[in-house]
Amino acid sequence: MCIRDRYAADRVEHIAKDLLPRLESGQTVLCDRYYFSNFAYQTLTSDLEDLLRYNAFARRTLRPDAVVFVDVDPEECARRRAHRGGAAEFYEKTELARQIRTGYQQVFDRLKTEEHILIVDGSGGPDQVEARIWSALQGYFESGVNEEITQP
């Protein structure tokens, strides 16, 4: 079994054992990453169309209502890492971050007619980014989705 298959199997298990039971019980579920992350990272070594085929079950079974992508320039990520201190994780290296960001952009471009993708500018301070996220979500829900969101 190759890594692509393992990620797809893990996604199916996550849906069946964690996400669906929570949704069926009426809980609101927020996920970080979900299948978009797998696609973005794996496009470094795999064809996106192949990845979409291998993950078709997950996408048919449980699609998110909306995807919020906080887009931060890799150079800014490096500055934030330096400010926080400590060593960068493997995936936090600037060049790899550029490639992964490109992967996300490819995924979002390919899926823009199939998914509700909200790209939020991640520059600035935490309060600014949070305000942009809430604004994007509010705009999405006001556009016709019968849901209401409230800020904590």
Name the predicted role of every residue range:
Residues M1-I3:
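Short, small-residue-biased leader/transition segments that mark boundaries at the very start
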Residues L30, A66-V68, L118-V120:
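Hydrophobic/aromatic beta-strand patches that form the interior of the parallel beta-sheet core
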Residues S25-Q27, P64, H116:
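Short coil/turn segments at beta-strand junctions that form active-site/ligand-binding loops
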Residues E75-P152:
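NTP-dependent small-molecule kinase module
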Residues N38-G103:
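A glycine- and Lys/Arg-enriched "phosphate-lid" helix/loop adjacent to the NTP-binding pocket
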Residues R33:
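Walker B catalytic acidic pair
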Residues Y7-V29:
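Phosphate-binding/switch loop-helix module in NTP-utilizing enzymes
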Residues L20-P21, A58-R60, D109:
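Short secondary-structure boundary/capping segments
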